[in-house]
Swiss-Prot record:
Lineage: Viruses, Varidnaviria, Bamfordvirae, Nucleocytoviricota, Pokkesviricetes
Name under which the protein is recorded: Transcription factor TFIIS homolog
GO MF, one example: nucleic acid binding
Record key words, sorted: Metal-binding, Transcription, Transcription regulation, Zinc, Zinc-finger
InterPro entries in UniProt: TF_IIS-typ (IPR035100), TFIIS_cen_dom (IPR003618), Znf_TFIIS (IPR001222)
PROSITE patterns: TFIIS_CENTRAL, ZF_TFIIS_1, ZF_TFIIS_2
Length: 243
């Protein structure tokens, strides 16, 4: 009961200076959700009260906690991110037909990203948060050019219910996209096994000095069913060219 009264008083004080009821409630609620004790709640809300009274706070720069939430968290950004996830999911016909579920999933994905990045210490909160959201948005995009829609493992699992939206944030790339990860791993393995030993030959003529004293090596830079690329180096002038 005392906590409830304290929260109402803080909202009143903040709004008195901000003159923005929606923003005031967002700030107060965010501080309350992030704090697991009344002491931490007061610790988070204190900078706002001070900034409001000194008129240093604006509606664009709203939240600061010296180390864990630096420099500022733009609360409106969370709404923008949620809308980004919503629009990405809506590209799939399943979510076009299930708008409520699409909204729920977009909110849960964003919330999980927010709480996940809140725990990270190495980077600034905003940098880590926006990076993580961008990665997941790319992964669940069914219109990606990198693969066909049926190969989108993460999106298909979301639709089938096998994967919950809030689970995305804690998964590795290999877990989110096993097909793409396996393909990438296979390509790396094959290329690492290539024979790249240099050989000497007079078959290739240097376009620079016109001599036929070159070393060459074969590298599989394209698909496996296409011929290897021949990289040549002239022993006379050092010019490098493709044979």
């Amino acid at each position: 009961m005392k906590m409830h009264i304290a929260r109402e008083s803080i909202v009143f004080l903040l709004n008195k200076h901000l003159q923005n009821t929606i923003l005031t409630k967002k700030i107060e609620q965010e501080c309350f959700l992030q704090a697991d004790t009344p002491k931490k709640y007061l610790q988070y809300i204190k900078p706002f009260l001070i900034n409001c009274m000194t008129k240093n706070i604006t509606t664009d720069l709203v939240m600061k906690d010296s180390k864990r939430l630096e420099p500022y968290i733009i609360l409106e950004m969370r709404d923008i991110i949620q809308m980004m996830f919503f629009r990405t999911l809506q590209k799939h016909i399943f979510f076009k037909k299930n708008t409520d579920l699409c909204t729920e999933y977009a909110q849960k994905i964003e919330a999980s990203c927010y709480h996940y990045t809140y725990q990270q210490q190495e980077k600034t909160f905003l940098e880590e948060y926006s990076t993580r959201c961008g990665t997941i948005n790319h992964i669940i995009n069914c219109e990606k050019k990198s693969h066909q829609q049926q190969d989108n493992d993460a999106l298909n699992k979301l639709i089938s219910g096998e994967l919950k939206p809030e689970q995305l944030v804690g998964m590795t790339f290999a877990e989110l996209c096993p097909s793409a990860a396996l393909k990438e791993k296979t390509e790396i393995t094959l290329r690492s096994q290539q024979k790249v030993a240099e050989k000497t030959s007079q078959l290739y003529k240097c376009p620079n000095c016109k001599q036929r004293m070159c070393t060459y090596r074969e590298v599989q830079t394209r698909a496996l069913d296409e011929p290897s690329t021949i990289f040549c180096t002239c022993k006379k002038c050092g010019h490098e060219f493709i044979g």
